[in-house]
A protein has these predicted regions:
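A structural signal for short loop-to-beta-strand junctions that line the ligand-binding cleft
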Residues: 118-192
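Short, polar/charged alpha-helical segment
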Residues: 38-62
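Acidic, glycine-anchored loop motifs typical of Ca2+
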Residues: 54-65, 72-78
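Gram-positive cell-envelope targeting signals
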Residues: 1-33, 42-45, 53
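Extracytoplasmic "Venus flytrap"/periplasmic binding protein-like
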Residues: 82-140
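Loop/turn elements at helix/coil->beta-strand transitions in domains of secreted/extracellular proteins
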Residues: 26, 60, 94-98
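Short acidic, S/G/P-rich loop/turn micro-motifs used as interaction or catalytic elements
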Residues: 34-39, 105-109
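Short, flexible/disordered intra-domain loops and linkers
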Residues: 36-39, 69-85, 117
Length: 193
């Protein structure tokens, strides 16, 4: 009887986790030289969600922003940077993320590994040996939704609206190249891209 109860509880727990697990419609990479506070990530997700659609058909629009921390400076925790690299490479190889927000410090720390990764602003793919990354990014303020975004100070947070605004204003936006990725030729995925 005890074994049966345990099996039922285990199966119930598994089914519950499957049913309540939220799958984002969009996962956006935030590649920075600092750790964005949780309130900053949440506000960024709220900013982007009204412009997104229900890609997975579950009746909800969910945007997830994932922060990857990279820097050439000594002020970044080595363990955190290594964990970011592992997550970044896994997400990049699975094509989970197609939109990248990045600051100069993090981008400079990574750019030697990004040949052919992004597409140019006109939608064409960068070649593997291309180094003209400035043609594959636009500034935060050049995106209307971001330019209008007004962060708010949340009670008990160290990061004020002014600090968050400054951090956001340093960001640039790049899109992953679809050519050569696993989404190439998949109509639904290309529509997302």
């Amino acid at each position: 009887l005890l074994v049966t109860v345990l099996v039922v509880a285990l199966v119930g727990s598994f089914v519950y986790s499957l049913v309540t697990n939220v799958h984002p419609d969009y996962t956006i990479a935030l590649v920075t030289s600092y750790s964005m506070p949780e309130t900053g990530l949440n506000q960024l997700e709220e900013c982007i969600t009204p412009y997104a659609d229900d890609r997975n058909g579950d009746g909800k629009v969910v945007v997830s922003v994932v922060n990857y921390v990279f820097s050439d400076g000594a002020d970044v925790d080595y363990t955190e940077q290594e964990a970011s690299m592992v997550r970044f490479m896994a997400d990049a190889s699975s094509n989970e993320v197609m939109i990248y927000l990045h600051d100069e410090g993090a981008f400079d720390a990574l750019k030697s590994n990004l040949g052919g990764f992004f597409q140019y602003n006109d939608g064409t793919a960068m070649s593997e040996d291309a180094k003209d990354f400035e043609n594959a990014m636009i500034s935060w303020d050049d995106v209307a939704a971001f330019a209008k975004f007004q962060p708010r100070t949340e009670e008990g947070e160290l990061y004020t609206a002014e600090v968050l605004s400054e951090l956001y204003s340093r960001l640039r936006v790049s899109c992953r190249a679809a050519e050569g990725s696993s989404i190439e030729g998949k109509e639904k995925d290309m529509a997302y891209h």
